[in-house]
Each structure stands twice: as C-alpha cells, then as structure tokens.
Amino acid sequence: MCVHFSQVRMSNLILADHKGRVVEGRHAINRAGFVLHAAVHDEYPEVMAMCHAHTTYGTAWCATGRPLDMISQDAAAFYNSHAVIGASAGAVAVEKESGLSVAQQIGRNRGVLHQNHGLLTCSHHSIDDAAFWFIALERACKQQLLVEASGIKPQLLSEKTARYSREHVGSDYIGWLHFQTLYNHIAETQPTCSPEARRAPPPR
C-alpha cells in the first residue's frame, strides 16, 4: 500500500494470510483489495492468480454494465469466458460479504467486468497467464470504446468465428506465452526486477 506502480519491486511486495495479516513484507495491506482477492481464493482454491485494477479503459467500459461485443479477435479470446458482475457496483469492498458477493459470480470466467468498478482476471495456471489476460482485457475495452465513439455500427463476429478464435487464441498456454515477451522486456529494462526469479513453466 502507498507504493506507486512505477516503484513496485519484488523486494517490496507483501505476503498476507487469509485473515489479512501481513506474513512477509513491511508495508500495510489495502483492505479493499484484500477483501476481494481473499474471497476469490476462498471460493475457488484452484485459482492460482488473480489480477484486479481500476484501469482507464476497463473502468470506463465497466460503467456501461455491458459485456464485450465480439468485434475483434482480441475480444473473441473472451467469448463466453467473461462476465459482467453488478454486485457491490461502485462500492468500496471493505466487508467480507462484499468480496464474497462478487467472487461467487465469477465462476469459470477468465475475465470479469465489475460494473462501475474495474477489471478482474483469473488463472488456474500462473501469474503470467492472469497478467497477460488482464492486459488483453483492458485492450479489448479500449477497442470497444473507440468503436462506440465512432458512431458506426460494427460488424460483429459470428458465434462460430468467435468460438473458433477463442479456442485458438484464448488458452492458458497463449496467455502464458504472450506474457513471456513482456516479462523479458521488464527484466531487461528494470534492473531492480530480478530475472532470476522462478518462472512458471508453460501449461501442458
């Protein structure tokens, strides 16, 4: 908490238990962030990693309360794999019940558009996978907003095409693979981010 994104390092991350107590690290915990993350991991023990933030385009699109339209291959990666959740819309989740009301609606979805709030992605495989799909979901929201702003009715992908694209570009392996280039760039350009950190192997 109180660490700018540009200053986040492996050395200043914290480890917290499911009661919100800091086990490792010297920073305080963000209560609202913890409540949501803890609820997801309690509800879905198989979830390896979850990403959540209030990004510009994601938060803007979440205000519409609508799922993504299948306007591109990027959006198709989330075909039948993302959900709009209206529970606790716009409210700061500081109570356990608020986190649970959101977590219980995630199901098997890779991405979540939390209405009036922001984006959330989950992975059953790795942090790499969850992180890439978070970036991809933000990009898909940006594309949707740009199309809407044009005032031109978009040509949507057919269900068959969207399903086909998701099967080929929406897997855990693709998420993991695409994040490797991002990780390598970070490791090379951010000298305080250790490239020797243990990496998750590719999904089988």
Where are these regions (language model features)?
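Glycine-rich flexible loops
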Residues: 1-204
